[in-house]
Amino acid sequence: MSRWPEVAAQLDRMVNQWYETPEIKRMLTVPLTPTRLAFRHLHMTFFGNNRRDCWAAVACTAPLDVKRAIWEHEKDELIYDPRMGKAHVTEEDLGNHKESDLIPGARAAVYAWLYCAREKPWLEGLACSHILERRNNDRIVKGGTLTQRLVKRQELELGIQRKDQDIGTQVHLIADVDHSALLDEVFTRYVIDDFAAQQVLRGAEESLAIERCFHGAVATAMAELD
């Protein structure tokens, strides 16, 4: 019998608690300016690029059916998303920037995520990546996701209407139900005992802690600009 329903419920609690941490509150309260927004956008571009690395790394050691689910999951982000008219991260998005341009806290988080994807058991690594999408699912997060809250703040503080904001931000305003369903099927099949359940919970907890470091570092640096 699958343990996934109870594990999923625990992940949902973890995700909502994540929004109450000091680092995420800092990101959600630092005053926005065009300069600060551009700084965050650069770091989120590399965040997206790191997601592509991590999903691929997990696929390397995952069973064949899980590789298929990851491949299906990644087609929009890596190759072409019709909602954006392009992949989620392109060479043009990265431009001449390198990971070494990121602030140290963000660079450390990027390396930590990649370490988890490469070195942890595949199920734990899968949970590391999955939880970052789960915490942006407005069907789970109470009070609006990080993306939704920042979009609203751009409207209020900078007068930038939703339709005029970055297309990648607009795409992530709505939970990707199809992607979630793909991975729900995987977790339902594989989370069948306490050992597997603990792997998923451990991977999710690790990743949420890493993301706190990422956003906390970026928010602190944003506050020092201007």
Language-model regions, residue ranges each:
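Non-heme di-metal
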Residues: 1-226
